[in-house]
Amino acid sequence: DVCSSDLAVSFSAQMMGCLPVDREGNPLRPMIIWADTRAVEEERWMVERIGMERGYEITGHRLSASYSAAKLIWVRRREPDIYRRWYKMLHAKDFIICRLTGKFVTDYSDASGTNLFDIRAKMWSEEILRALDLDEELLPELHPSTDIAGGVTKAAAEATGLLEGTPVVIGGGDGSCACVGAGVVDEGSAYLVLGSSSWISLASREPLFDPEMRTFNWVHLDPELYTPCGTMQAAGYSYQWYRNALCRGEMEEAAKTGESPYERINRGIMESAPGAGGLLYLPYLLGERSPRWNPDARGAFVGLSVTTGKHDLSRAVLEGVGYNLRVILESMRREREMKELMLIGGGAKGQTWPRILSDIFQMPLKIPAYREEATSMGAAVCAGVGVGIYRDFSEAKRINTIVDTVMPREENRLRYDRLYEIFNHAYDALTGVYGELGAYRKDMGEKHE
């Protein structure tokens, strides 16, 4: 058995996907995940039908190919046979819940990443469904994250080793679970996740609406809170791409010594001065959500010269992610004061990247003991609240205590402030090129996702 005294099961999983299943809960096609932006044409159609501003007002999100609704419509248009057999759309965690309990449910946090959810009323939006000619019956039943979907069935118990009847607490999307795991459970507290993708978010009693629609809103695991958020697509992905594409030597040497190749790259970064010799990296390998909302955007190095060295390239990648995150941070600071950020995720390991980010933000970063496990911890706390083991979500702060604080260095402020402005100018200058390349990829039949 997995455990002889299971108290509850709950989940954290990727958000904004689209998995159509039949009445038995069997997938009708592979899930279209959050990073897949194939539904660009569907996004444009949605904007025509609803209006970008109205969509943002209802859902707390821009209308975008990144979200579930555009993916659903893509399937309806391009895979009609699958659409005819469609019973429910599920997210990743909801599919597992269905397997364990036989129930087709989702929680408010995952629903808030569909472009179909009324963020204030916490219900599927009749206005949007009507505009898109969608039936609410295609969508799962809505619940708070702490609701119990049901008990583990006998068949699921035999397949998994879980105890039959174990309560299955619905849990939430990884963004909302990370918020709880980071201890961001009080109004105004904020955090940064530095993972494959990256986001900055805070806890708020009300959704926050950016006049330029650069940020968006999830529902917190606590149904009385929201998590206004800005997310970039390729943070850790940028570092992973760079390692795989340009650091074969470091990978081979690391394999010989048993250390992480990132440790070797990070040591080299210390040989490049802050600012990477005036080299900029634009981290748009997967297009971009906030702050740019441009699925055609792509990555670039700007400022290469004959004096550019390998360590400058390495530093520029980490700094470029930091500049992009600062755009998100500053848009959120317009609405709420933030004096410090909790830092979690794989990028929080070591000192190199956290120190670069602290300098670019000119803000302290607090690092908890469980920096890589925060999302699963958030789901575990949700399970505890759901079955009554914990009184409320404040338990997360007791479990995941602060073990380190990275302070910004004043001597790097001017350098990074200036490069941050140039970074934004570089993006603006390349927007036309991104559009032309997007049209080229479409004309040549190359994949957008």
Predicted regions: what they are:
Residues 40, 47-62, 66-105, 115-133, ...:
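Active-site core segments that coordinate phosphate-bearing ligands/cofactors
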Residues 9:
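Acidic/charged, solvent-exposed loop-and-adjacent secondary-structure segments enriched in E/D, K/R, S/T
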Residues 22-23:
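Short, acidic, Ser/Thr-enriched surface-loop or helix-capping motifs
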Residues 36:
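Carbohydrate-associated surface elements
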Residues 13-15:
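Short, small/polar residue-rich loop motifs at catalytic or cofactor-binding pockets
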Residues 2-4:
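Short, small-residue-biased leader/transition segments that mark boundaries at the very start
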